[in-house]
Amino acid sequence: MSWLRTSPLRQSLTRNSGGNGSGGSGNSGNASATVRQRPIDAATDCDPRACYDSFCKHWQQAHEIIQHAGPPTHDDVLGVVSHLDYMVTLLLVELHHCNKVSLPTADAAPPTAPCLEYLLSENLLDKLYEWASTTGRYANAVRLEQLKLYELLVSHSRHQLLCHEPFLRPLLKILASSQGEIFPPDLEKRLVILLNQLCVVLMQNVHLLDLFFFSAQTQVQEQIQNGSLAAPKSGTTTNFIIFSLLIPYVHREGSLGHQARDALLLCMALSQKNSNIGHYIAQYSSICPLLVTGLGGLYSRLPNSIEVSAIDWHRITPDDVAEIPELTLFMNALEFCNAVVQVAHEMIKQQLLDFMYQGFIVPVLGPAILQTLKGKHFQTNIDSQISAMSYLDLILRSITEPGLMRAFVKFLLDTEKFDGERILDALVERLHSPDANLCMVTMALFDTLLGLHCEDLMLELLLKYMLPGKHVPISHRHKINKIDPYLNTTEFFLELTPDVMKRARDLARPKSVHELVDPGAALSSTMLPSLPSPVMSKTIGANWNYYGHYTGDSLYANIQAYLFEAHSRIAQCQRDCGKWANNYRYQKWPRQGQVRATSHALELARQFFSEFGTATPVAVAAVASSELGEKQLDSLQSIGESSGYESFKWRPDDADANDATTTTATSDPDVEHNNSSNHNNSSINSSGRRDLWRVSHSARNEILLTDLDFSEDLFAQGTVNLGPFLNAIWGKLQTFTSNSLYVNLHLTGLITRLAWYPLPLIHSLLLRSDIAITSDTPSFHQVLRMLKQQIDAELPVAENSLEIIDVARSSLIDREFRLINARKVSDNSPLHQQHHQQQQLQHTTNSTHQQQQAQQRSTYATLSAATPMHATPTSAYDPFRRSDNKRRSISASISNIFGRKSTSSTAAANPNPASSGLSQIYAFFTGAASTLVGGINGEVNSRGVAQENPRGNTCETSLSTTPRLDAQATSASSTNSSIGGSTQTLSATHSSSTLHGVESGPQTASFNSEPVSMDSVASMGIIANTSGTERSRDLALCAVLLDEWLKELAAIALEQSVVLVTEQLL
């Protein structure tokens, strides 16, 4: 927002030629008939005396016309306007001359402005206003010239003239007379420009604010007494006239609305510096209800169904906002509300937040998301649900103020406004949707919610189901905070790689290096089925030199890239989670407080045994002896740090527990406790409601987690529920091999985001393979094992499988490079730069990071480390052979490939079909031109129409960097991605990683049209392969994606162990 920008000044003025306008009105009218251009040059030297004489002469002639008896005629008005136009020109020349004078010295007098002094001394502005009020139907024309004159004087003289009564008084008169009037567009534009300039001057000279505010009040009172202005309906004469005149233009389109909103924001900022302004806006203006009702009206105009052509579309991008006019207006209003909350007085801020929640969020967004009308659910199609959730996701990514964010978090968790139904629960239910588009939009929304790092949301989604610790067996709970198993988990994830991926990696590695680096793998590879030694090709990525990239810049199989990404994401998450009110991690008794902790455990043991009425002197004696330092074995292996039985159960709020907690906290200052929260309720709904959606450090405390909670049955059997959110995620993961590629990318990205949280509780589910889970669903690691077994069974290590794996990897690398270059093109577009300024840039793309690292680290220069070579047993392709001297574009290469009439004619015309990387991919297939069919695995699309005819929609989702690009407009959104999809933001600024797809308009079935992307073709299984079925091709994509995701999880586990070590050292 350009809050302090000044209005653009006139660079040239249209002036009248002909007569001087002397005499009567007839001559004046003839003089204004001929028009000539008369540009004003600031460097033009002029005689100040001649300018002054000419200025006085024009005013005398205009004054003669004003003094005429009777109502003004058309010629009279034209004459006065003509003379006033010349006076404005002379004033502009004089002011330019005054402004360009060098810096004054101590004894130098300020430059004189005789024309301006004459204007003020003769009270010309007041006389002109009084005459303009009698012009009748010509009032707007005269008012326009007056506004031009005031605009000129304010813009050049800054604040000096506001202190002069001959200038301020007529200015307030003309502003007061403009209230409640409907003006033509040109007059509205001049009025808003003048008001904007006045706000800028007042912002820079706050000491004039009280004078202007109370002068406006006095002026209104005088006009009411004179009868020229009706008394306000509110019964008060208090009026900040600049603000009141700007309110009607707050929802206007175009530059007029932008300037009005900028001026209103300046008034809001002034309210923090002057309590009178804040009190007036909050008590006597209607700006807050007007903003909220306007926002609701603009939301109702949004399309009920968003037309998308890409099968991987999952969220609204800045390009979509620019292409939908209704959405553009809505986002302007939302950003303005966000800015008002940021800069306004506390009274205004609180009033706007209350109106937003009660007037827009609950009554408008709630029914739209829940698809309800008057409390009853109504039948809707998938498209309306997708659009409503996309709008909510866009809103959450656009707002930045904690107050607004807190209102939306409360909205998601509120159970009173929607008859006991929570918005968050409804969103979780949609994760089970069989519709791929709705599922992707829902996962993108949850990715945004998890990216907020909000304690209340995490508590409701995961932590409240994990805090009791019952998902971990008692015998395993002592392992939660251990660091060594994280390194073992890294090996565990790498071992889960499908066998076909291991075999492909072994074949791609040179034998000498293979035996030198991993001699153990050579032994294990002998256990695999023997295959004929294929003719190995170089990495396909290295062949695509027309991208202008070296293959080592690819993120495929680049463990350094995953480590870099994991480190930055975990660090950011750790900073945000450090502001939480509670520390959700397993907490053992500190060593320095071991004596006090053991005494507390002894008291708990006595209470426990007293409930059964059984004396246990052995156990009590054992604990007592441990206080004296004696090492004895407890008869009941539940007390003591070394027993290994720990619980996450929160401390009960009874008097004894509170007394014990107080005693412990008093004796040990290093351990902080919190007994005011209840883990079953979100803090947004609890009695101790916090004001911030992400709690500050001042409110930080830690939850006391004891070594043992005796309220838990030690011999209880059965499983526990991890909550609907994790159950839905695990359910989707179990159908990994049946999901589409884009659903799997979002799914892996969502789980990856959870793994970034520096919480050992979450790590016990995701990153700790040595901890057993007693949930009612298969654990995360069990699901991964099942996926490996399924892929190994259905995609055995064979020559055909290796070919399909090679094609799958090649197509993903192909898409990565194309999208990197598409993003570079879009970064230079004006649309991208505009949205880049509107939001915070949270993170650059992974590919850009790695390209910079490639220039600094020698490890990235190693070809085999960055992108392993691919096994292509049937290809004799040499990647270093070139038949042309120029680098070609991707679109031309694809068009040349698919523009051939037949495979046989192609082979005959080009005996060396491996002139590009895509040619090698194309050589793997036969009959591709005749076997293109639409749809995903024969299913219907999201619109309910069967995809029988081929469409040329280029739909892509990259493993590394996947901005959404319009193939014809060549513009992409500023988003970032990592393997499996990572964070999402706008930001502009803000931003965040998404899995956008490249889309183009509908095309014909001819290959002369826009081609289908290799990745979308492969993911839909519509390329016929001589040696593979559609199911095998889908499994190949799943295997490649799973392999890369396991590497990313291994990198996260490694970085999380570093974080834990650092915390202990600090």
From Swiss-Prot:
Keyword DNA repair: no
UniProt similarity note: Belongs to the FHIP family.
Annotated positions of the Phosphoserine modification: 512, 829
InterPro entries: FHIP, FHIP_C, FHIP_KELAA_motif
Keyword field contains Oxidoreductase: no
Full protein name: FHIP family protein GH13096
UniProt-annotated stretches for the region Disordered: 1-33, 647-688, 827-885, 942-1010
Compositionally biased spans, kind Polar residues: 1-15, 950-963, 1001-1010
